[in-house]
Swiss-Prot record:
Source organism superkingdom: Bacteria
Known function: Globally modulates RNA abundance by binding to RNase E (Rne) and regulating its endonucleolytic activity. Can modulate Rne action in a substrate-dependent manner by altering the composition of the degradosome. Modulates RNA-binding and helicase activities of the degradosome.
Molecular functions (GO terms): endoribonuclease inhibitor activity; enzyme binding
A GO biological process held by the record: regulation of RNA metabolic process
Protein name: Regulator of ribonuclease activity A
Keywords on record: Cytoplasm
Localization (cell): Cytoplasm
Length: 173
């Protein structure tokens, strides 16, 4: 399904938080949405792998990597696991690598930047905790909507079928 964050903001402005514009698209899917699962880790992606091995239908993984630009928290192998388990998308407050592989995958991926250096795999971090970056506090089970324009967050699911919110014009005799 396609999502348009600009249209969603126009309709639901009082219900959404807008993440500061700092992310770039790296995945093959330009827009994505779902209920978030959070991982908070720093230069260590073991918990990301563990989480992506779960069923991801209707879910978006939100990774607070502390904004580190020194190591990539997501690579082609982890993105393939996410795609296989049907995750809608991944947002990384940090870096990714193997970007040519990422853009060929049917998953939405947004991150700060890319770097070729991989992360450690020691399992240090937390899952399903509130995280804060980009001027927004993300709570587990909030709903995230992302496209090439930006990322928005809502406590409740938003109707993506924007057509149904418009009234049909009355026909005059």
């Amino acid at each position: 399904m396609e999502y348009n964050t600009s249209a969603l903001c126009d309709i639901y402005m009082d219900q959404v938080d807008v993440v500061e514009p700092m992310f770039s698209n790296f995945g093959g899917r330009a827009s994505f949405a779902g209920q978030i699962t959070t991982v908070k880790c720093f230069e260590d992606n073991a918990l990301i792998r563990e989480t992506l091995e779960q069923d991801g239908v209707g879910r978006v993984l939100l990774v607070d990597g502390g904004g580190s630009l020194r190591r990539a928290l997501l690579d082609g192998e982890l993105a393939a696991i996410a795609e296989e388990n049907e995750w809608e998308g991944i947002v990384v407050y940090g870096c990714v690598r193997e970007v040519d592989e990422l853009e060929d995958m049917n998953i939405g991926i947004q991150a700060l930047a890319s770097i070729p250096v991989s992360a450690a795999m020691q399992g240090v971090g937390e899952v399903d905790v509130p995280v804060n970056f980009g001027g927004v506090t993300f709570l587990p089970e909030d709903y995230l909507y992302a496209d090439t324009t930006g990322i928005i967050l809502s406590q409740e699911p938003l109707s993506a079928d924007l057509e149904e919110d418009e009234e049909e014009p009355e026909l005059l005799d």
